[in-house]
Swiss-Prot record:
Subcellular location: Cell outer membrane
Highest taxon, organism lineage: Bacteria
Keywords, comma-separated and alphabetical: Cell outer membrane, Membrane, Signal, Transmembrane, Transmembrane beta strand
GO cellular component: cell outer membrane
Family under the similarity heading: Belongs to the Omp25/RopB family.
Entry protein name: 25 kDa outer-membrane immunogenic protein
InterPro entries attached to this UniProt entry: OMP-like, OMP/PagP_b-brl, OMP_b-brl
Gene: omp25
Length: 213
């Protein structure tokens, strides 16, 4: 009986230490709470935009009388469009209008370009802050020929295609660089009784800045 009483007293004395050790083990066995992961916000290209561009063109005007004339030029204008986005695919429509200062003479025949514009489809791939894209559509330009005796100006319609890279500079400001090839086909001009056939091809590099709504 005395032994049993001693055992009860010893067990009661050790009980707080056992509870403390068990609590410590329970605390240590809890898995650590992972730190929250910060996810960068995904930029959306969807919506409307407008902007300005400045470019330089390498042109080739083939004529039936004096051969090829190369009226390289500076050009400037404005663009506007609307994008739709599905996952990482961005697609939409864009138009531009501007002025080309292309003008050059050869053997008495002058070729001069003026207003130019286009209406195109665009498709790009969203890389979050940058978007490479392809574009193609119809183009138009005012092209004038002058042989010193007479001149004639015609609005020419052709096609254009190109590629570019657009980048997000701020939440609403976009920057871009674009290459475009445009062909206006063949057209006859009547200059003082002489028929001059002309074909104009242009290659442009354009840089632009835009505002996304």
């Amino acid at each position: 009986m005395r032994t049993l009483k001693s055992l009860v007293i010893v067990s009661a004395a050790l009980l707080p230490f056992s509870a403390t050790a068990f609590a410590a083990d329970a605390i240590q066995e809890q898995p650590p709470v992972p730190a929250p992961v910060e996810v960068a916000p995904q930029y959306s290209w969807a919506g409307g935009y407008t902007g300005l561009y400045l470019g330089y063109g390498w042109n080739k005007a083939k004529t039936s009388t004096v051969g090829s004339i190369k009226p390289d030029d500076w050009k400037a204008g404005a663009f506007a469009g609307w994008n739709f986005q599905q996952d990482q695919i961005v697609y939409g429509v864009e138009g531009d209008a501007g002025y080309s200062w292309a003008k050059k003479s050869k053997d008495g025949l002058e070729v001069k370009q003026g207003f130019e514009g286009s209406l195109r489809a665009r498709v790009g791939y969203d890389l979050n802050l940058v978007m490479p894209y392809l574009t193609a559509g119809i183009a138009g330009s005012q092209i004038k020929l002058n042989n010193g005796l007479d001149d004639e100006s015609k609005f020419r319609v052709g096609w254009t295609a190109g590629a570019g890279l657009e980048a997000k500079l701020t939440d609403n400001i976009l920057g871009r660089v674009e290459y475009r090839y445009t062909q206006y086909g063949n057209k006859n001009y009547d200059l003082a009784g002489t028929t001059v056939r002309n074909k104009l091809d242009t290659q442009d590099i354009r840089v632009g800045i835009g505002y996304k709504f």
